[in-house]
Regions:
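Hydrophobic transmembrane alpha-helices and their helix-loop junctions in integral membrane proteins
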Residues: 106-155, 165-454, 458
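Membrane-helix interface motif
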Residues: 15-23, 71-81, 202-212, 397-411, ...
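Aromatic-capped, Gly/Pro-kinked transmembrane alpha-helices
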Residues: 486-509, 526-602
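Hard-cation-handling environments
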Residues: 459-515
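Alpha-helical transmembrane segments
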Residues: 1-14, 60-70, 101, 134-141, ...
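Transmembrane helix-loop-helix hairpins at membrane boundaries of multipass inner-membrane proteins
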Residues: 1-134, 209-219, 247, 278, ...
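Hydrophobic alpha-helical transmembrane segments
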Residues: 94-100, 225-237, 424-431, 501-521
Protein backbone atom coordinates (compact mmCIF):
# COMPACT_ATOMS: atom_id res chain seq x y z
CA UNK A 1 0.00 0.00 0.00
CA UNK A 2 2.82 2.41 0.84
CA UNK A 3 4.52 1.73 -2.50
CA UNK A 4 1.25 2.27 -4.39
CA UNK A 5 0.63 5.52 -2.52
CA UNK A 6 4.12 6.81 -3.34
CA UNK A 7 3.77 5.90 -7.02
CA UNK A 8 0.33 7.51 -7.30
CA UNK A 9 1.47 10.65 -5.47
CA UNK A 10 4.50 10.92 -7.77
CA UNK A 11 2.26 10.67 -10.84
CA UNK A 12 -0.17 13.22 -9.40
CA UNK A 13 2.58 15.75 -8.65
CA UNK A 14 4.13 15.23 -12.08
CA UNK A 15 0.90 15.72 -14.02
CA UNK A 16 -0.08 18.70 -11.85
CA UNK A 17 3.12 20.70 -12.34
CA UNK A 18 4.49 19.47 -15.68
CA UNK A 19 5.34 22.37 -17.98
CA UNK A 20 5.52 24.89 -15.16
CA UNK A 21 8.29 26.09 -12.89
CA UNK A 22 7.02 26.47 -9.34
CA UNK A 23 9.06 28.27 -6.68
CA UNK A 24 8.48 28.18 -2.93
CA UNK A 25 10.19 30.43 -0.41
CA UNK A 26 10.46 29.00 3.10
CA UNK A 27 12.70 31.68 4.57
CA UNK A 28 13.98 31.44 8.13
CA UNK A 29 10.97 29.34 9.12
CA UNK A 30 10.40 26.53 11.57
CA UNK A 31 10.86 24.09 8.68
CA UNK A 32 14.21 25.64 7.86
CA UNK A 33 15.32 25.31 11.47
CA UNK A 34 14.15 21.70 11.41
CA UNK A 35 16.80 20.93 8.80
CA UNK A 36 19.46 21.66 11.40
CA UNK A 37 17.86 19.17 13.79
CA UNK A 38 17.82 16.53 11.05
CA UNK A 39 21.52 17.16 10.36
CA UNK A 40 22.24 16.52 14.04
CA UNK A 41 20.12 13.34 14.10
CA UNK A 42 21.89 12.00 11.01
CA UNK A 43 25.24 12.74 12.65
CA UNK A 44 24.17 10.94 15.82
CA UNK A 45 23.27 7.88 13.75
CA UNK A 46 26.71 7.96 12.13
CA UNK A 47 28.40 8.38 15.52
CA UNK A 48 26.44 5.42 16.92
CA UNK A 49 27.52 3.04 14.16
CA UNK A 50 31.09 4.31 13.82
CA UNK A 51 31.95 4.81 17.50
CA UNK A 52 29.67 2.56 19.56
CA UNK A 53 29.03 -0.50 17.37
CA UNK A 54 31.99 -0.84 15.03
CA UNK A 55 34.71 1.51 16.36
CA UNK A 56 35.56 3.19 13.04
CA UNK A 57 36.51 6.45 14.73
CA UNK A 58 38.18 8.11 11.76
CA UNK A 59 34.90 7.93 9.83
CA UNK A 60 33.16 9.63 12.76
CA UNK A 61 35.77 12.38 12.50
CA UNK A 62 34.69 13.08 8.90
CA UNK A 63 31.09 13.48 10.05
CA UNK A 64 32.09 15.65 13.01
CA UNK A 65 34.11 18.02 10.80
CA UNK A 66 31.33 18.64 8.30
CA UNK A 67 28.58 18.85 10.94
CA UNK A 68 30.63 21.34 12.94
CA UNK A 69 31.31 23.39 9.81
CA UNK A 70 27.63 23.51 8.82
CA UNK A 71 26.44 24.40 12.35
CA UNK A 72 29.08 27.14 12.58
CA UNK A 73 27.95 28.54 9.23
CA UNK A 74 24.28 28.44 10.28
CA UNK A 75 25.22 30.44 13.38
CA UNK A 76 27.41 33.12 11.77
CA UNK A 77 25.14 33.57 8.73
CA UNK A 78 21.85 33.75 10.63
CA UNK A 79 19.78 36.62 9.27
CA UNK A 80 22.23 37.44 6.46
CA UNK A 81 21.24 34.89 3.80
CA UNK A 82 18.80 35.52 0.98
CA UNK A 83 16.24 32.71 1.25
CA UNK A 84 14.53 33.13 -2.11
CA UNK A 85 13.65 30.03 -4.14
CA UNK A 86 14.23 27.40 -1.44
CA UNK A 87 12.08 24.83 -3.24
CA UNK A 88 11.96 24.67 -7.05
CA UNK A 89 9.79 22.25 -9.01
CA UNK A 90 10.58 22.16 -12.73
CA UNK A 91 10.34 19.48 -15.40
CA UNK A 92 13.71 17.93 -14.56
CA UNK A 93 12.71 17.76 -10.90
CA UNK A 94 9.45 16.06 -11.89
CA UNK A 95 11.31 13.54 -14.06
CA UNK A 96 13.44 12.65 -11.04
CA UNK A 97 10.33 12.41 -8.84
CA UNK A 98 8.81 9.95 -11.32
CA UNK A 99 12.02 7.90 -11.44
CA UNK A 100 12.27 7.69 -7.65
CA UNK A 101 8.53 7.32 -7.03
CA UNK A 102 7.50 4.85 -9.73
CA UNK A 103 10.66 2.75 -10.10
CA UNK A 104 11.38 2.90 -6.37
CA UNK A 105 7.84 1.70 -5.62
CA UNK A 106 8.16 -1.19 -8.07
CA UNK A 107 11.41 -2.21 -6.38
CA UNK A 108 9.60 -2.11 -3.02
CA UNK A 109 6.84 -4.39 -4.40
CA UNK A 110 9.47 -6.77 -5.78
CA UNK A 111 11.21 -6.77 -2.39
CA UNK A 112 8.21 -8.29 -0.59
CA UNK A 113 8.59 -11.68 -2.25
CA UNK A 114 12.32 -11.48 -2.77
CA UNK A 115 13.20 -10.70 0.85
CA UNK A 116 10.94 -13.49 2.14
CA UNK A 117 12.79 -16.00 -0.04
CA UNK A 118 16.12 -14.35 0.85
CA UNK A 119 15.54 -14.89 4.57
CA UNK A 120 14.56 -18.53 4.03
CA UNK A 121 17.68 -19.12 1.95
CA UNK A 122 20.03 -17.25 4.31
CA UNK A 123 18.95 -18.51 7.72
CA UNK A 124 22.18 -17.24 9.25
CA UNK A 125 21.13 -13.64 8.45
CA UNK A 126 19.05 -11.93 11.12
CA UNK A 127 15.54 -11.23 9.83
CA UNK A 128 15.33 -7.43 9.77
CA UNK A 129 12.81 -6.98 6.99
CA UNK A 130 10.85 -4.33 8.87
CA UNK A 131 14.04 -2.31 9.24
CA UNK A 132 14.87 -2.91 5.57
CA UNK A 133 11.55 -1.50 4.35
CA UNK A 134 11.72 1.42 6.78
CA UNK A 135 15.12 2.44 5.42
CA UNK A 136 13.98 1.85 1.83
CA UNK A 137 11.02 4.24 2.16
CA UNK A 138 13.16 6.74 4.08
CA UNK A 139 15.59 6.58 1.17
CA UNK A 140 12.84 7.39 -1.34
CA UNK A 141 11.55 10.21 0.86
CA UNK A 142 15.04 11.72 1.05
CA UNK A 143 15.32 11.57 -2.73
CA UNK A 144 12.08 13.53 -3.10
CA UNK A 145 13.39 16.16 -0.71
CA UNK A 146 16.76 16.30 -2.44
CA UNK A 147 15.47 16.86 -5.98
CA UNK A 148 13.04 19.65 -5.03
CA UNK A 149 15.62 21.52 -2.92
CA UNK A 150 17.09 24.63 -4.49
CA UNK A 151 18.59 25.78 -1.19
CA UNK A 152 21.91 23.96 -0.82
CA UNK A 153 21.43 23.76 2.97
CA UNK A 154 18.26 21.69 2.50
CA UNK A 155 19.83 19.64 -0.27
CA UNK A 156 22.79 18.90 2.02
CA UNK A 157 20.42 17.57 4.70
CA UNK A 158 18.74 15.13 2.31
CA UNK A 159 22.12 14.31 0.77
CA UNK A 160 23.39 13.08 4.13
CA UNK A 161 20.23 11.05 4.73
CA UNK A 162 20.77 9.17 1.45
CA UNK A 163 24.38 8.45 2.46
CA UNK A 164 23.29 6.93 5.78
CA UNK A 165 20.43 4.97 4.15
CA UNK A 166 22.78 3.42 1.60
CA UNK A 167 25.17 2.51 4.42
CA UNK A 168 22.37 0.75 6.33
CA UNK A 169 21.02 -1.11 3.29
CA UNK A 170 24.43 -2.30 2.08
CA UNK A 171 25.22 -3.68 5.54
CA UNK A 172 21.86 -5.44 5.90
CA UNK A 173 23.27 -8.98 6.25
CA UNK A 174 25.75 -7.83 8.95
CA UNK A 175 28.45 -10.13 7.57
CA UNK A 176 32.03 -8.95 7.73
CA UNK A 177 32.14 -8.28 3.97
CA UNK A 178 28.83 -6.40 4.07
CA UNK A 179 29.92 -4.27 7.02
CA UNK A 180 33.26 -3.40 5.41
CA UNK A 181 31.62 -2.43 2.14
CA UNK A 182 28.91 -0.42 3.88
CA UNK A 183 31.58 1.60 5.69
CA UNK A 184 33.42 2.09 2.41
CA UNK A 185 30.23 3.60 0.98
CA UNK A 186 29.81 5.74 4.09
CA UNK A 187 33.29 7.25 4.23
CA UNK A 188 33.45 7.96 0.51
CA UNK A 189 30.10 9.73 0.60
CA UNK A 190 31.01 11.58 3.79
CA UNK A 191 34.08 12.82 1.95
CA UNK A 192 31.72 14.20 -0.67
CA UNK A 193 29.55 15.61 2.09
CA UNK A 194 32.55 17.52 3.44
CA UNK A 195 33.09 19.04 -0.02
CA UNK A 196 29.37 19.92 -0.09
CA UNK A 197 29.65 21.67 3.29
CA UNK A 198 32.73 23.58 2.11
CA UNK A 199 30.88 24.74 -1.02
CA UNK A 200 27.95 25.99 1.07
CA UNK A 201 30.23 27.94 3.40
CA UNK A 202 32.25 29.55 0.58
CA UNK A 203 29.12 30.55 -1.32
CA UNK A 204 27.23 31.75 1.75
CA UNK A 205 30.06 33.88 3.09
CA UNK A 206 30.96 35.30 -0.32
CA UNK A 207 27.56 35.88 -1.93
CA UNK A 208 25.16 35.70 1.06
CA UNK A 209 23.09 33.04 -0.68
CA UNK A 210 22.91 29.26 -0.78
CA UNK A 211 20.50 28.95 -3.70
CA UNK A 212 21.60 26.56 -6.44
CA UNK A 213 19.88 28.64 -9.13
CA UNK A 214 21.69 31.75 -7.84
CA UNK A 215 25.02 29.94 -8.16
CA UNK A 216 24.29 29.10 -11.80
CA UNK A 217 23.23 32.70 -12.41
CA UNK A 218 26.47 34.00 -10.89
CA UNK A 219 28.50 31.69 -13.14
CA UNK A 220 26.63 32.84 -16.25
CA UNK A 221 27.24 36.45 -15.20
CA UNK A 222 30.99 35.80 -15.14
CA UNK A 223 31.42 35.89 -11.37
CA UNK A 224 34.34 33.88 -9.88
CA UNK A 225 32.49 30.82 -8.58
CA UNK A 226 34.74 28.08 -10.00
CA UNK A 227 35.90 26.96 -6.54
CA UNK A 228 32.27 26.45 -5.45
CA UNK A 229 31.48 24.57 -8.66
CA UNK A 230 34.54 22.34 -8.26
CA UNK A 231 33.61 21.45 -4.67
CA UNK A 232 30.04 20.57 -5.67
CA UNK A 233 31.35 18.49 -8.57
CA UNK A 234 33.65 16.59 -6.20
CA UNK A 235 30.61 15.93 -4.05
CA UNK A 236 28.69 14.72 -7.10
CA UNK A 237 31.60 12.49 -8.14
CA UNK A 238 31.50 10.59 -4.85
CA UNK A 239 27.74 10.09 -4.93
CA UNK A 240 27.63 9.07 -8.61
CA UNK A 241 30.58 6.66 -8.18
CA UNK A 242 33.00 8.32 -10.59
CA UNK A 243 36.51 6.93 -10.58
CA UNK A 244 38.35 6.92 -8.19
CA UNK A 245 35.25 6.79 -5.93
CA UNK A 246 33.56 3.88 -7.73
CA UNK A 247 34.67 1.29 -5.19
CA UNK A 248 31.69 1.83 -2.92
CA UNK A 249 29.18 1.04 -5.68
CA UNK A 250 31.02 -2.15 -6.65
CA UNK A 251 31.09 -3.14 -2.98
CA UNK A 252 27.34 -2.61 -2.73
CA UNK A 253 26.84 -5.89 -4.65
CA UNK A 254 26.96 -7.76 -1.34
CA UNK A 255 23.57 -6.28 -0.45
CA UNK A 256 20.27 -7.96 -1.38
CA UNK A 257 19.27 -7.36 -5.00
CA UNK A 258 16.55 -4.74 -4.28
CA UNK A 259 19.21 -2.58 -2.63
CA UNK A 260 21.43 -2.82 -5.70
CA UNK A 261 18.51 -1.97 -7.97
CA UNK A 262 17.58 1.01 -5.81
CA UNK A 263 21.13 2.37 -5.63
CA UNK A 264 21.77 1.99 -9.36
CA UNK A 265 18.48 3.17 -10.82
CA UNK A 266 16.29 5.48 -8.78
CA UNK A 267 18.25 6.86 -5.81
CA UNK A 268 21.86 7.29 -4.64
CA UNK A 269 23.84 7.56 -7.90
CA UNK A 270 21.01 9.51 -9.55
CA UNK A 271 21.31 12.09 -6.76
CA UNK A 272 24.91 12.72 -7.80
CA UNK A 273 24.17 13.20 -11.49
CA UNK A 274 21.08 15.28 -10.64
CA UNK A 275 23.26 17.86 -8.88
CA UNK A 276 25.84 17.85 -11.68
CA UNK A 277 23.20 18.26 -14.41
CA UNK A 278 21.67 21.13 -12.45
CA UNK A 279 25.09 22.81 -12.63
CA UNK A 280 25.38 22.09 -16.36
CA UNK A 281 24.77 25.69 -17.64
CA UNK A 282 27.53 26.95 -15.34
CA UNK A 283 30.09 24.46 -16.70
CA UNK A 284 31.78 24.11 -20.06
CA UNK A 285 34.01 27.16 -20.24
CA UNK A 286 35.83 26.86 -16.93
CA UNK A 287 38.16 24.45 -15.19
CA UNK A 288 35.36 22.91 -13.15
CA UNK A 289 33.65 21.92 -16.41
CA UNK A 290 36.92 20.57 -17.80
CA UNK A 291 37.32 18.42 -14.68
CA UNK A 292 33.80 17.01 -15.09
CA UNK A 293 34.32 16.33 -18.80
CA UNK A 294 37.49 14.31 -18.39
CA UNK A 295 36.62 12.53 -15.14
CA UNK A 296 33.31 11.49 -16.71
CA UNK A 297 34.85 10.51 -20.04
CA UNK A 298 37.67 8.50 -18.48
CA UNK A 299 35.25 6.75 -16.12
CA UNK A 300 32.95 5.92 -19.04
CA UNK A 301 35.73 4.32 -21.06
CA UNK A 302 37.59 2.36 -18.38
CA UNK A 303 34.47 1.12 -16.57
CA UNK A 304 33.09 -0.13 -19.86
CA UNK A 305 36.38 -1.92 -20.59
CA UNK A 306 36.45 -3.47 -17.10
CA UNK A 307 32.97 -4.94 -17.64
CA UNK A 308 34.28 -7.07 -20.53
CA UNK A 309 36.32 -9.29 -18.20
CA UNK A 310 33.47 -9.95 -15.74
CA UNK A 311 31.16 -12.96 -15.61
CA UNK A 312 29.34 -12.00 -12.39
CA UNK A 313 26.01 -10.58 -13.56
CA UNK A 314 25.81 -7.99 -10.80
CA UNK A 315 29.36 -6.82 -11.40
CA UNK A 316 28.73 -6.41 -15.13
CA UNK A 317 25.68 -4.30 -14.29
CA UNK A 318 27.68 -2.31 -11.73
CA UNK A 319 30.43 -1.44 -14.22
CA UNK A 320 27.80 -0.65 -16.83
CA UNK A 321 26.16 1.74 -14.37
CA UNK A 322 29.46 3.45 -13.56
CA UNK A 323 30.19 3.73 -17.27
CA UNK A 324 26.86 5.34 -18.13
CA UNK A 325 27.06 7.67 -15.15
CA UNK A 326 30.46 8.73 -16.47
CA UNK A 327 28.89 9.60 -19.81
CA UNK A 328 26.20 11.65 -18.05
CA UNK A 329 28.83 13.57 -16.06
CA UNK A 330 30.92 14.09 -19.20
CA UNK A 331 27.92 15.56 -21.05
CA UNK A 332 27.10 17.83 -18.11
CA UNK A 333 30.70 19.04 -18.03
CA UNK A 334 30.44 20.25 -21.62
CA UNK A 335 27.63 22.53 -20.47
CA UNK A 336 25.96 22.96 -23.85
CA UNK A 337 22.25 22.73 -24.61
CA UNK A 338 22.70 19.51 -26.60
CA UNK A 339 24.84 17.90 -23.91
CA UNK A 340 22.31 18.72 -21.19
CA UNK A 341 19.51 17.17 -23.29
CA UNK A 342 21.60 14.04 -23.77
CA UNK A 343 22.45 13.73 -20.07
CA UNK A 344 18.80 13.91 -19.00
CA UNK A 345 17.66 11.38 -21.60
CA UNK A 346 20.36 8.92 -20.52
CA UNK A 347 19.22 9.32 -16.90
CA UNK A 348 15.68 8.32 -17.92
CA UNK A 349 16.53 5.31 -20.07
CA UNK A 350 19.23 4.03 -17.75
CA UNK A 351 16.95 4.16 -14.70
CA UNK A 352 14.24 2.00 -16.28
CA UNK A 353 16.42 -0.57 -18.07
CA UNK A 354 18.96 -0.98 -15.28
CA UNK A 355 16.33 -1.52 -12.57
CA UNK A 356 14.78 -4.23 -14.76
CA UNK A 357 18.14 -5.93 -15.26
CA UNK A 358 19.08 -5.92 -11.58
CA UNK A 359 15.74 -7.40 -10.54
CA UNK A 360 16.01 -10.01 -13.31
CA UNK A 361 19.50 -11.06 -12.21
CA UNK A 362 18.37 -11.22 -8.59
CA UNK A 363 15.45 -13.44 -9.54
CA UNK A 364 17.68 -15.72 -11.61
CA UNK A 365 20.14 -15.96 -8.73
CA UNK A 366 17.41 -17.09 -6.32
CA UNK A 367 16.06 -19.69 -8.74
CA UNK A 368 19.36 -21.00 -10.15
CA UNK A 369 21.60 -20.48 -7.13
CA UNK A 370 24.09 -18.34 -9.07
CA UNK A 371 24.35 -14.98 -10.79
CA UNK A 372 27.34 -16.05 -12.89
CA UNK A 373 26.52 -15.43 -16.56
CA UNK A 374 28.25 -18.71 -17.44
CA UNK A 375 25.50 -20.47 -15.45
CA UNK A 376 22.75 -18.84 -17.52
CA UNK A 377 22.95 -21.48 -20.27
CA UNK A 378 19.47 -22.53 -21.27
CA UNK A 379 17.72 -19.79 -19.33
CA UNK A 380 15.42 -19.55 -22.34
CA UNK A 381 14.26 -23.11 -21.60
CA UNK A 382 14.20 -22.96 -17.82
CA UNK A 383 12.77 -19.47 -17.32
CA UNK A 384 11.43 -18.14 -20.64
CA UNK A 385 9.47 -15.22 -19.20
CA UNK A 386 12.39 -14.04 -17.07
CA UNK A 387 14.68 -14.50 -20.07
CA UNK A 388 12.41 -12.20 -22.09
CA UNK A 389 12.63 -9.56 -19.35
CA UNK A 390 16.44 -9.77 -19.49
CA UNK A 391 16.44 -9.51 -23.27
CA UNK A 392 14.28 -6.38 -23.13
CA UNK A 393 16.54 -4.81 -20.49
CA UNK A 394 19.75 -5.62 -22.38
CA UNK A 395 18.26 -4.42 -25.66
CA UNK A 396 17.28 -1.18 -23.99
CA UNK A 397 20.89 -0.67 -22.90
CA UNK A 398 22.72 -1.01 -26.21
CA UNK A 399 20.65 -1.98 -29.26
CA UNK A 400 19.07 0.25 -31.90
CA UNK A 401 16.49 1.74 -31.95
CA UNK A 402 16.22 1.79 -28.15
CA UNK A 403 16.78 4.99 -26.20
CA UNK A 404 20.31 4.49 -24.86
CA UNK A 405 21.81 4.15 -28.34
CA UNK A 406 19.92 7.21 -29.59
CA UNK A 407 21.19 9.15 -26.57
CA UNK A 408 24.76 8.16 -27.42
CA UNK A 409 24.13 9.40 -30.96
CA UNK A 410 23.13 12.74 -29.43
CA UNK A 411 26.23 12.67 -27.19
CA UNK A 412 28.42 12.20 -30.25
CA UNK A 413 26.79 15.24 -31.86
CA UNK A 414 27.26 17.29 -28.68
CA UNK A 415 30.97 16.36 -28.47
CA UNK A 416 31.56 17.24 -32.12
CA UNK A 417 29.73 20.57 -31.85
CA UNK A 418 31.69 21.43 -28.70
CA UNK A 419 35.00 20.63 -30.42
CA UNK A 420 36.28 17.91 -28.09
CA UNK A 421 37.93 15.18 -30.23
CA UNK A 422 39.45 13.42 -27.20
CA UNK A 423 36.03 13.01 -25.59
CA UNK A 424 34.68 11.80 -28.92
CA UNK A 425 37.31 9.05 -29.03
CA UNK A 426 36.46 7.98 -25.47
CA UNK A 427 32.77 7.86 -26.43
CA UNK A 428 33.32 5.87 -29.63
CA UNK A 429 35.65 3.25 -28.16
CA UNK A 430 33.79 3.11 -24.84
CA UNK A 431 30.50 2.51 -26.64
CA UNK A 432 32.07 -0.15 -28.85
CA UNK A 433 33.19 -2.15 -25.81
CA UNK A 434 29.61 -2.42 -24.56
CA UNK A 435 28.89 -4.76 -27.47
CA UNK A 436 31.34 -7.27 -26.00
CA UNK A 437 29.65 -7.80 -22.65
CA UNK A 438 26.01 -7.32 -23.66
CA UNK A 439 26.32 -9.61 -26.71
CA UNK A 440 27.99 -12.32 -24.58
CA UNK A 441 25.16 -12.08 -22.07
CA UNK A 442 22.48 -12.29 -24.77
CA UNK A 443 24.15 -15.31 -26.33
CA UNK A 444 24.17 -17.20 -23.04
CA UNK A 445 20.55 -16.64 -22.07
CA UNK A 446 19.17 -17.33 -25.56
CA UNK A 447 21.03 -20.61 -25.97
CA UNK A 448 18.93 -23.79 -25.89
CA UNK A 449 20.28 -26.60 -23.70
CA UNK A 450 19.32 -30.14 -22.74
CA UNK A 451 17.85 -31.15 -19.42
CA UNK A 452 16.49 -27.75 -18.43
CA UNK A 453 13.42 -27.86 -16.22
CA UNK A 454 11.01 -24.99 -15.71
CA UNK A 455 11.99 -23.02 -12.60
CA UNK A 456 9.66 -20.06 -12.67
CA UNK A 457 7.14 -21.50 -10.20
CA UNK A 458 8.95 -20.01 -7.21
CA UNK A 459 8.63 -16.42 -8.43
CA UNK A 460 5.88 -14.54 -6.59
CA UNK A 461 3.14 -12.44 -8.18
CA UNK A 462 4.67 -9.28 -6.72
CA UNK A 463 8.01 -10.04 -8.33
CA UNK A 464 6.35 -10.75 -11.68
CA UNK A 465 4.37 -7.52 -11.43
CA UNK A 466 7.54 -5.47 -10.95
CA UNK A 467 9.46 -7.30 -13.69
CA UNK A 468 6.69 -7.13 -16.29
CA UNK A 469 5.84 -3.51 -15.50
CA UNK A 470 9.48 -2.47 -15.89
CA UNK A 471 9.71 -4.46 -19.13
CA UNK A 472 6.75 -2.60 -20.59
CA UNK A 473 8.11 0.69 -19.24
CA UNK A 474 11.41 0.08 -21.06
CA UNK A 475 9.53 -0.41 -24.33
CA UNK A 476 7.03 2.42 -23.80
CA UNK A 477 9.69 4.96 -22.80
CA UNK A 478 11.52 4.21 -26.07
CA UNK A 479 8.30 4.51 -28.09
CA UNK A 480 7.45 7.81 -26.39
CA UNK A 481 10.97 9.18 -26.91
CA UNK A 482 9.74 12.15 -29.05
CA UNK A 483 7.04 13.08 -26.52
CA UNK A 484 9.41 12.83 -23.56
CA UNK A 485 11.81 15.12 -25.38
CA UNK A 486 9.19 17.65 -26.53
CA UNK A 487 7.07 17.88 -23.39
CA UNK A 488 9.48 16.79 -20.67
CA UNK A 489 13.06 17.80 -21.42
CA UNK A 490 12.86 20.68 -23.91
CA UNK A 491 10.62 22.90 -21.69
CA UNK A 492 13.17 22.58 -18.87
CA UNK A 493 16.03 23.46 -21.22
CA UNK A 494 14.04 26.40 -22.60
CA UNK A 495 13.78 27.87 -19.10
CA UNK A 496 17.39 27.03 -18.26
CA UNK A 497 19.11 28.18 -21.46
CA UNK A 498 16.57 30.71 -22.74
CA UNK A 499 16.04 29.01 -26.10
CA UNK A 500 14.99 25.67 -27.54
CA UNK A 501 15.86 23.57 -30.57
CA UNK A 502 15.77 19.91 -31.53
CA UNK A 503 18.98 18.06 -30.69
CA UNK A 504 17.93 15.22 -32.98
CA UNK A 505 15.37 15.99 -35.67
CA UNK A 506 11.85 15.14 -34.53
CA UNK A 507 11.31 13.12 -37.71
CA UNK A 508 14.27 10.88 -36.82
CA UNK A 509 12.93 10.34 -33.31
CA UNK A 510 9.53 9.36 -34.72
CA UNK A 511 11.17 6.88 -37.10
CA UNK A 512 13.04 5.33 -34.16
CA UNK A 513 9.80 5.08 -32.18
CA UNK A 514 8.05 3.36 -35.09
CA UNK A 515 10.93 0.90 -35.31
CA UNK A 516 10.44 -0.02 -31.64
CA UNK A 517 6.71 -0.55 -32.30
CA UNK A 518 7.54 -2.84 -35.24
CA UNK A 519 10.03 -4.77 -33.10
CA UNK A 520 7.19 -5.51 -30.68
CA UNK A 521 4.50 -6.30 -33.27
CA UNK A 522 6.32 -8.21 -36.02
CA UNK A 523 7.75 -11.10 -33.93
CA UNK A 524 4.29 -11.81 -32.53
CA UNK A 525 2.68 -11.83 -35.99
CA UNK A 526 5.34 -13.29 -38.25
CA UNK A 527 4.96 -16.89 -39.33
CA UNK A 528 1.61 -17.62 -37.67
CA UNK A 529 -0.22 -20.38 -39.52
CA UNK A 530 2.64 -20.88 -41.99
CA UNK A 531 4.78 -24.01 -42.38
CA UNK A 532 8.18 -23.56 -40.77
CA UNK A 533 11.44 -24.84 -42.23
CA UNK A 534 13.81 -26.10 -39.57
CA UNK A 535 17.55 -26.25 -40.24
CA UNK A 536 19.92 -28.04 -37.89
CA UNK A 537 22.67 -26.10 -36.15
CA UNK A 538 26.26 -26.48 -37.33
CA UNK A 539 28.12 -28.06 -34.40
CA UNK A 540 31.61 -29.42 -33.73
CA UNK A 541 30.53 -32.86 -34.95
CA UNK A 542 27.55 -34.66 -36.47
CA UNK A 543 24.35 -33.11 -35.16
CA UNK A 544 22.20 -35.71 -33.41
CA UNK A 545 19.09 -33.89 -34.61
CA UNK A 546 18.08 -32.00 -31.50
CA UNK A 547 20.67 -29.16 -31.85
CA UNK A 548 21.77 -29.89 -28.29
CA UNK A 549 24.15 -32.82 -28.79
CA UNK A 550 26.62 -33.99 -31.42
CA UNK A 551 28.66 -37.13 -32.14
CA UNK A 552 32.36 -36.83 -31.51
CA UNK A 553 35.27 -38.57 -33.24
CA UNK A 554 34.72 -41.70 -31.16
CA UNK A 555 31.01 -41.78 -32.08
CA UNK A 556 30.18 -40.78 -28.51
CA UNK A 557 27.40 -38.27 -27.86
CA UNK A 558 28.68 -34.95 -26.49
CA UNK A 559 26.35 -32.25 -25.12
CA UNK A 560 26.73 -28.75 -26.55
CA UNK A 561 28.42 -26.27 -24.23
CA UNK A 562 28.89 -22.56 -24.83
CA UNK A 563 31.61 -20.59 -23.09
CA UNK A 564 32.52 -16.93 -23.35
CA UNK A 565 35.97 -15.42 -23.69
CA UNK A 566 36.48 -12.66 -21.13
CA UNK A 567 39.81 -11.28 -22.41
CA UNK A 568 41.21 -10.88 -18.91
CA UNK A 569 44.75 -10.51 -20.22
CA UNK A 570 43.71 -7.32 -22.03
CA UNK A 571 40.75 -5.98 -20.05
CA UNK A 572 41.46 -7.31 -16.56
CA UNK A 573 39.51 -5.57 -13.82
CA UNK A 574 42.57 -4.59 -11.79
CA UNK A 575 44.36 -3.15 -14.81
CA UNK A 576 41.35 -1.10 -15.94
CA UNK A 577 40.58 0.16 -12.43
CA UNK A 578 44.14 1.25 -11.71
CA UNK A 579 44.41 3.05 -15.05
CA UNK A 580 41.06 4.80 -14.62
CA UNK A 581 41.73 5.69 -10.99
CA UNK A 582 45.16 7.15 -11.76
CA UNK A 583 43.94 9.28 -14.67
CA UNK A 584 40.87 10.56 -12.82
CA UNK A 585 42.88 11.35 -9.68
CA UNK A 586 45.43 13.22 -11.78
CA UNK A 587 42.66 15.17 -13.50
CA UNK A 588 41.02 16.13 -10.19
CA UNK A 589 44.29 17.16 -8.54
CA UNK A 590 45.48 19.17 -11.54
CA UNK A 591 42.20 21.04 -11.94
CA UNK A 592 41.94 21.78 -8.22
CA UNK A 593 45.56 22.97 -8.21
CA UNK A 594 44.79 25.34 -11.07
CA UNK A 595 41.55 26.56 -9.49
CA UNK A 596 42.83 26.98 -5.95
CA UNK A 597 46.26 28.18 -7.01
CA UNK A 598 44.77 31.00 -9.01
CA UNK A 599 46.82 30.22 -12.10
CA UNK A 600 43.70 30.92 -14.14
CA UNK A 601 40.32 32.32 -13.29
CA UNK A 602 37.48 29.97 -14.29
Amino acid sequence: MSAAAIAMLSLFVAFTYFGNKVVFRLGDSFLAQGAILVDILVALAVFYYTCVRFHRYWIALLEAIQLGAVLWFEYVSHGTLDYYADIVVDNFTLIMILIAGVIGSLIAVFSLGYMEAFQKEHRDVRDRRNFFFFVLFLFLSAMFGLVVSNNLLYMYTFWEITSVCSFLLIGYTESRVAVNNSFKALWMNLLGGAAFAAAIIVMGLTYHSTALSHLVGLALAGMPVTVILALLLLCGFTKSAMMPFSGWLLGAMVAPTPTSALLHSSTMVKAGVFLIIKLCPALGNNHAGTMAMFVGGITFFFASCAAISQSDGKKVLAYSTISNLGLIVCCAGIGSYEAAWTAIMIVIFHAVAKSLLFLSVGTAEQQLGSRDIERFDGLFNAMPHLCLCMVIGISGMFLAPFGMLISKWAAMKAFIDAGHPMLLLLLVFGSATTIFYWAKWLGKILSVMNGQERREQGITQGEWFALKTLSWMTIIVCILFPLISSYGVLPYLRITYGFTRDVIAQSNLIIMSLMVVLLVILPSRYGKGQPKRKVGALLAGVNTGDDRNYRGAGDNIIPVELRNWYMEEWFGEKKMKLSGFALCMACIFIQFAIILGGVYRG
